[in-house]
Every structure is written in structure tokens, then in C-alpha cells.
Swiss-Prot record:
Keyword ATP-binding: yes
Name of the molecule in the record: Aspartyl/glutamyl-tRNA(Asn/Gln) amidotransferase subunit C
NCBIfam families to which the protein is assigned, alphabetical: gatC (TIGR00135)
Entries under SUPFAM superfamilies matching the protein: Glu-tRNAGln amidotransferase C subunit
GO terms (BP aspect): glutaminyl-tRNAGln biosynthesis via transamidation; regulation of translational fidelity; translation
Pfam families the record matches: GatC
Source organism (scientific name): Streptococcus pneumoniae (strain P1031)
InterPro entries to which the protein is assigned, alphabetical: Asp/Glu-ADT_sf_sub_c, GatC
Keywords: ATP-binding, Ligase, Nucleotide-binding, Protein biosynthesis
Length: 100
């Protein structure tokens, strides 16, 4: 499956990323190769092969859900450069949120 430069540009725009034309072409080529490799997996005959759900040889180990005392909020916010009513203020990275 060929990934076009237009598709790469579209996804980059949704992600608020900017790439040069050369980078976009390289991404399109690389992504096309990756998709082709993944599509090859569909050709493998897995008849009679049991599904693999995990590579771990043990079952999920869950800890008891016990409430513990948390860290003091004032102590946590001691090193925060800017805050407002216990919210950490950070610089905006998106102009208006776009259409994503």
C-alpha cells in the first residue's frame, strides 16, 4: 500500500507538525514500506495455531486496591514555577486547538 505525501502532510497537520518536502517524501516512502511489511503478515498460514494473548508466562498480578495517604499538595507545588489554585500553568502549545 502506497502512502502518499498528501496523506503524510494531512496527518502532520492534524498533529501540528511541519516537515519539509524532502522529509515528507522520506516519511511517505518509509511508511509505505512498513505497511507493506505488516500486510505480509496476512499471508501467513496460521491454521491450527492457537492465538497468543501474552508473551508472559504468568497471569496478571493485581495488587489490592487500598487507599494510601498521598503526598502533601503544598510540598508537590513547591517547585512549580507558575500555578493558579493548585493547577500548574504551562505555556500554550496549540494556537486555537485547530480541527483536531
Amino acid at each position: 500500500m502506497k502512502i502518499t505525501q498528501e496523506e503524510v502532510t494531512h496527518v502532520a497537520n492534524l498533529s501540528k507538525l511541519r516537515f519539509s518536502e524532502k522529509e515528507t517524501a522520506a516519511f511517505a516512502t518509509t511508511l509505505s514500506k512498513i505497511v507493506d511489511m505488516v500486510e505480509l503478515l496476512g499471508e501467513v498460514d496460521t491454521t491450527g495455531v492457537a492465538p497468543t494473548t501474552t508473551m508472559a508466562d504468568r497471569k496478571t498480578v493485581l495488587r489490592p486496591d487500598v487507599a494510601e495517604e498521598g503526598t502533601d499538595r503544598d510540598r508537590l507545588f513547591k517547585n512549580v514555577p507558575e500555578q493558579d489554585n493548585y493547577y500548574i500553568k504551562v505555556p500554550a502549545i496549540l494556537d486555537d486547538g485547530g480541527d483536531a
